[in-house]
Amino acid sequence: MAVNLTEKTAEQLPDIDGIALYTAQAGVKKPGHTDLTLIAVAAGSTVGAVFTTNRFCAAPVHIAKSHLFDEDGVRALVINTGNANAGTGAQGRIDALAVCAAAARQIGCKPNQVMPFSTGVILEPLPADKIIAALPKMQPAFWNEAARAIMTTDTVPKAASREGKVGDQHTVRATGIAKGSGMIHPNMATMLGFIATDAKVSQPVLQLMTQEIADETFNTITVDGDTSTNDSFVIIATGKNSQSEIDNIADPRYAQLKELLCSLALELAQAIVRDGEGATKFITVRVENAKTCDEARQAAYAAARSPLVKTAFFASDPNLGKRLAAIGYADVADLDTDLVEMYLDDILVAEHGGRAASYTEAQGQAVMSKDEITVRIKLHRGQAAATVYTCDLSHGYVSINADYRS
């Protein structure tokens, strides 16, 4: 059950000049499910991408990394769901390359101009023959249809759009889709994210922007603490809005475009948490007054990924000990626990090393019963802060994963 998340309509997701979308039923996932997506990219576009840090990364990740920086430029992204093509050895790479070659024939480019992406069951051979056979049968699609086609255990398609001024004269459009529900943890989580914009950005600058946006959005979420083998986040800049190229991070338009795309990416990232497997609550954990951003992030993740804390949220249990314990084992050097303050929404619940004198169990229960909760922790040792987004851990998470292959 997704937390305050609804499906976007095609009208809410405008087309991006220079991008064409296609989908098909390849039979990789389950019969009757659309499970294949192709994003065709206009010549002259630039692409930035970041990938999972899991050392067991999937075959398509290896291929996508090598094709990203090819001098010929990226002309297509092909995405299948139902099979991750991970843990498949050399044959997995052969299959991913075969899919690239077939997609290249379909749109009229070179195989090295196609980036492959897969998501689904690990340790199963990719049925490349099904994907190759389905490519000629693909039909034009809208963004909301593409968002549905890349889903695995997701319950709601995830898509968003933004429009805004970049520079004095040009309006920039951006639309993106993402998938993810379980195996969600930073660097990156089991998620795929694709954003297209009509802005014009040089490839090196777009690559840097993509990494920065990932760090500020998709790398601030956690559902279950597992880092997947297939995670990928891609930004495509088609350059079709007639503006001059952004080729330097000192260009004021860099910050303007990054802010616009960051807003879009954060909505997609939060949508993944809202649709976390079995989630019934959306939780924001913010740590303030840390010495460094890394320290703040470390403390926030300790609270956000703790199974004890997450199950307490599911149970609407205002027991504070689990939250304080999580901060205590976050390995923040020389932490003075007497200075730490913790809030549930705006209610002070802990200070001076223990329970706040003003706090009552009834206050905590009222907050914990909500479906959206903010936990704010003040360390009182500096000016740095970090925010992490998570969800509760319910019986539904166990059921979904127990039944995933059945």
UniProtKB/Swiss-Prot annotation:
Q: To which species is this protein native?
A: Neisseria gonorrhoeae
Query: Which major enzyme category is it?
Result: transferase
Question: Which residues does the entry assign to the active site, renumbered to this chain?
Answer: T190
Q: Give the metabolic or biological pathway.
A: Amino-acid biosynthesis; L-arginine biosynthesis; L-ornithine and N-acetyl-L-glutamate from L-glutamate and N(2)-acetyl-L-ornithine (cyclic): step 1/1; Amino-acid biosynthesis; L-arginine biosynthesis; N(2)-acetyl-L-ornithine from L-glutamate: step 1/4
Question: Member of which family?
Answer: Belongs to the ArgJ family.
Q: One GO molecular function term?
A: L-glutamate N-acetyltransferase activity
Name the positions where substrate binds: T152, K179, T190, E277, N401, S406
One Pfam match, by short name? Answer: ArgJ
Where, subcellularly, is it found? Cytoplasm
State the protein's purpose: Catalyzes two activities which are involved in the cyclic version of arginine biosynthesis: the synthesis of N-acetylglutamate from glutamate and acetyl-CoA as the acetyl donor, and of ornithine by transacetylation between N(2)-acetylornithine and glutamate.
Sorted alphabetically, the Gene Ontology cellular component annotations on this record are: cytoplasm
Q: Which domain of life is it from?
A: Bacteria
Q: Site described as Cleavage, positions?
A: A189, T190
| UniProt subunit comment | Heterotetramer of two alpha and two beta chains.
* EC code: 2.3.1.35, 2.3.1.1
Does the keyword Transit peptide feature in the UniProt annotation? Answer: no
Q: Which Gene3D superfamilies match?
A: ArgJ beta chain, C-terminal domain, L-amino peptidase D-ALA esterase/amidase
Which UniProt key words apply to this protein? Acyltransferase, Amino-acid biosynthesis, Arginine biosynthesis, Autocatalytic cleavage, Cytoplasm, Multifunctional enzyme, Transferase
A biological-process GO annotation? L-arginine biosynthetic process
Instruction: Give me the reactions it catalyses.
Output: N(2)-acetyl-L-ornithine + L-glutamate = N-acetyl-L-glutamate + L-ornithine; L-glutamate + acetyl-CoA = N-acetyl-L-glutamate + CoA + H(+)
Protein name, as recorded: Arginine biosynthesis bifunctional protein ArgJ
List the InterPro entries hit by this protein, alphabetically. Arg_biosynth_ArgJ, ArgJ-like_dom_sf, ArgJ_beta_C
